[in-house]
Each structure stands twice: as C-alpha cells, then as structure tokens.
C-alpha cells in the first residue's frame, strides 16, 4: 500500500511548525498516513522535535513542486495532502495533468481560495488556478470556506476541517470568573501581515469608539517588517493618544501571547477572507468576542457553534461589547467544533479520505 504524503508547499514557518508538531503529537502514532512530509523551508530543529515524522525539506517552492510532480508521475497511486498550498507550480501541474485529481487533496487555509491581489501576474494566474481547483480530488476547509468554494466549484467534494490551533482545553473556563469594566482594550489584527489592513482597521475602530479605548496591534510576525510597522504606528498616532496605542513589534512566545489576549475586551478583524483562526480561537476561549468583516465567511462557523458575532458594519459601543461578552460566557466551550481536541475527529476522517480508505 502507498502511504499518503503531506505537502507544505510554501515557506510559512509558524504555520508549518504548528502542523508538523500536531501530526507528530496527535496523529502519527495511530496512522501511517500521518508521517510522511515534504516541506518548503529550513529544518531549524523540526526533525528533532518531531521524531515520529519523516520530513524532507526543500529550499524553495519550485524544487519541492518538481519533486512532488516526479513522484506523482512515477506512481499514479501516490496520493498527496496539500496543506495551505500557495505554490503556483503545483496548481499548474494539476491543471496540465502532471498531478491527477485522484492524487490531489487540499486543505484550504484561506489565501489560495480568495483572489485579493491586484498585481498583473496574479490577475493572469487566478483564472488558471480557478480551472485547476475544479480538478481537486477533495477539499477540506471551514464551513464558510466550503460554502465559498462551492459557489464556483459545486462538483468538487468538500469536507469540514479546522486548522489545528494550539490550545489547552483546560483553559476553556478561564474567563468565566473575570469581571470586565473600565476602559476597553481592543486587539486589532492577528499578525503584522499586510492582509490585516491595519491602517483601515485602526480608522474603523476610531470611528466607532474614538480615543476612548486602548488599541493593541500585534506585529511581531512576519520578521523584517519594520517599515510597515512604522507606517502603522504613525497612522495610529494620528488617531489615538500615545497611551492608547500599543504596537507590538517583537514576536511573543505562546504563553505571553495568551496573557496579552486575556487583557483584551474585543478582537477586531477587518480582512474580507478567512484567516487568523488561531487568534480567533484563543480569543473566544478567553471569553472575548470578535468583530468580523461580513465578507469573512468564518462567521458561518461561529454562528453554527452558537457564538456571538459582531460585524464591522454594526454600530458598536461598550454596552454591545459587554452583552456579547455575557453571551460568550454562557457558551460551553468544550463543545465548540473548531477547538482542541474536538477538531481531531475531523483530521482522522480527512486522513482516511485522502489515503483512499474512507467513505
């Protein structure tokens, strides 16, 4: 029997590390289809920290894609589980027949589903990628992304699956005994990536609340982002007093990030696509409601789990935020489908489907 190969086709260190550690800790011991990986990026100790996995590293997207295509052509029974993707050569290989639909299983992370870039090369590539996506054997995604994908690709099989956010289930009740009062603290964005549209988000928060709230903007990831961080800082200082604006330019360790989130009263995410599910999960776990763009389909997943959702188009004030906090406090967080360990069942099913052993 041919063992399933997992492909992390783009160098996204934080996400790739999360996936590898999740497979090593939660899946590899019980499934032979959870052990083989091809990854773009440097080892940086990952092999040592994930001893249950066999990981082959590649210096770039093209070299990985060439290796995947060669394996696919050499053995048409070989199946691949593409996580996130973000690799144009692989899409073109699927479109041209280098990789067959029966070999291609894709976990949607968001960016490769939406067509938000305005550059000419992207405009030329998007129609080809759309054609290739019609040939995917099966897609795995959030409820909202499945709905979005089905509008243009109704014949492609879709299965519910959530990114394996690092979470401690014992913290599900950590917010229940906390009293929230006084000046509100609002988290803006989930990272320093431009897709967070930080300046527009800061303006939106100011329009709703003025300079009456403290705004925290985590921008420690990705690295080498100093020019953009300074641009956001200057824009923020035009809107908020210095004491009400906190720009975090250093990457925080997980426990420090958790502690930061617990000090917030609201998360504000203006982006119009599904992203940042990890931060959303950690905020919800801490009893902190989130404001989403109505175009972000993840609101469908939240309402399915009976979670309060606020939108950027709503008229927001402190009373509305406090009411959302009260509603969130009444939810049994141990039942939320996209929380750990509940998402594990979806991963076990996804492995079986991608390996050709499931219904």
Curated annotation (Swiss-Prot):
Catalytic activity: beta-D-ManNAcA-(1->4)-alpha-D-GlcNAc-di-trans,octa-cis-undecaprenyl diphosphate + dTDP-4-acetamido-4,6-dideoxy-alpha-D-galactose = alpha-D-FucNAc4-(1->4)-beta-D-ManNAcA-(1->4)-D-GlcNAc-undecaprenyl diphosphate + dTDP + H(+)
GO molecular function term, any single one: fucosyltransferase activity
Record GO cellular component, one term: plasma membrane
Cited Pfam families: Glyco_transf_56 (PF07429)
Lipid bilayer topology: Peripheral membrane protein
Primary enzyme class: transferase
Record EC number: 2.4.1.325
Transmembrane domains' residue ranges: none
Location in the cell: Cell inner membrane
Chief subcellular location: membrane
Alphabetical UniProt keywords: Cell inner membrane, Cell membrane, Glycosyltransferase, Membrane, Transferase
Pathway in which this enzyme or protein is active: Bacterial outer membrane biogenesis; enterobacterial common antigen biosynthesis
NCBIfam families: PRK02797.1-1, PRK02797.1-2, PRK02797.1-3
Role description: Catalyzes the synthesis of Und-PP-GlcNAc-ManNAcA-Fuc4NAc (Lipid III), the third lipid-linked intermediate involved in ECA synthesis.
Name of the protein: TDP-N-acetylfucosamine:lipid II N-acetylfucosaminyltransferase
Biological source species: Escherichia coli O8 (strain IAI1)
High-level lineage: Bacteria, Pseudomonadati, Pseudomonadota, Gammaproteobacteria, Enterobacterales
């Amino acid at each position: 029997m041919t063992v399933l190969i997992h492909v992390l086709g783009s160098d996204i260190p934080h996400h790739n590390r999360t996936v590898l550690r999740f497979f090593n800790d939660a899946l590899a011991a019980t499934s032979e289809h959870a052990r083989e990986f091809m990854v773009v990026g440097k080892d940086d100790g990952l092999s040592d920290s994930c001893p249950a996995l066999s990981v082959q590293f590649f210096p770039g997207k093209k070299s990985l894609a060439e290796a995947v295509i060669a394996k696919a052509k050499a053995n048409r029974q070989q199946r691949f589980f593409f996580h996130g993707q973000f690799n144009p050569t692989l899409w073109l290989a699927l479109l041209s027949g280098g990789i067959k639909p029966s070999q291609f299983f894709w976990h949607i992370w968001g960016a490769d589903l939406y067509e938000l870039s305005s550059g000419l090369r992207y405009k030329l590539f998007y129609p080809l990628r759309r054609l290739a996506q019609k040939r995917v054997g099966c897609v795995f995604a959030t409820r909202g992304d499945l709905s979005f994908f089905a509008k243009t690709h109704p014949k492609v099989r879709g299965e519910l699956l959530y990114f394996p956010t690092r979470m401690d289930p014992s913290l599900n009740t950590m917010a229940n005994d906390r009293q929230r009062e006084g000046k509100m603290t609002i988290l803006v964005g989930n990272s320093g990536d431009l897709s967070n549209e930080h300046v527009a988000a800061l303006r939106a928060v100011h329009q709703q609340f003025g300079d009456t709230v403290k705004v925290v903007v985590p921008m420690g990831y990705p690295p080498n982002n100093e020019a953009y961080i300074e641009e956001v800082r200057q824009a923020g200082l035009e809107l908020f007093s210095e004491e009400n604006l906190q720009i975090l330019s250093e990457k925080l360790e997980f426990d420090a990030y958790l502690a930061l989130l617990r000090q917030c009263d609201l998360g504000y995410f203006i982006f119009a696509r599904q992203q940042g599910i990890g931060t959303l999960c950690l905020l919800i776990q801490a009893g902190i409601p989130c404001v989403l763009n109505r175009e972000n389909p993840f609101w469908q997943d939240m309402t399915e789990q009976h979670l309060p959702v606020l939108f950027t188009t709503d008229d927001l004030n402190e009373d509305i935020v406090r009411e959302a906090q009260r509603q969130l406090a009444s939810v049994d967080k141990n039942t939320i489908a996209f929380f750990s360990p509940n998402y594990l069942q979806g991963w076990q099913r996804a492995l079986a489907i991608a390996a050709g052993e499931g219904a």
